Amino acid sequence: MNNSQLSKLISLTKPLVSREVNEIHEINQENSPDVGDIPSIKEFKELIELSEEIYVFKDKDKIIGFILLMREGSSYKSENYKFISSQYDRFFYVDRIAIQSNYRRRGLAETIYKKAINDAKRLGLDLLCEVNTRPRNDISLAFHSKMGFREIGTQDFTKNSVVYLCKR
């Protein structure tokens, strides 16, 4: 199945219905630790409420991939978000992106990212994110390099290390 056979990429309107939250949460947990683990559905719903944009891919009516984007000025407590906020006044921050395992390697993440990049450009914003370097996420590092992201900083935490990336 290729992208043209999937429902097109759409932006969800908040508040999300329970089914949407549950489907996105399930994909998030399947992709942990590459994306942050959030076991509590309540905490995950709170994260969704803090996000500025949520783009999803669907296969028929089921969500199979997503990206959560934050803007500046959020009350989000993430150390990575705080670092980005300390460096940039206006931005789109990719908090997480994940694709359901049996839909990977089909260009969905690239399509979602292209939409985020185009929307950021349209708004005059940089698109920012972080990728784990400990544990090392080589697939994500290669992907972001291919998409034209450049390094803007690094940070070491107790459990992991990250590189911060920017796409202008």
Regions found by a protein language model. Give the residues of each.
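Conserved acetyl-CoA-binding loop-helix of GNAT-fold acetyltransferases
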Residues: 99, 105-118, 146
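A short beta-loop-alpha structural element at the N-terminal edge
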Residues: 3-26
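Active-site rim helix/loop that mediates acceptor-substrate recognition in acyltransferases
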Residues: 34-60
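Conserved GNAT acetyl-CoA-binding A-motif
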Residues: 120-133
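A short, internal acetyl-CoA/4′-phosphopantetheine-binding micro-motif in the GNAT/acyltransferase core
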Residues: 85, 95-104, 133-134
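A short helix-loop-beta-strand connector motif used in the catalytic cores of GNAT acetyltransferases and
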Residues: 46-56, 65, 70-72, 93
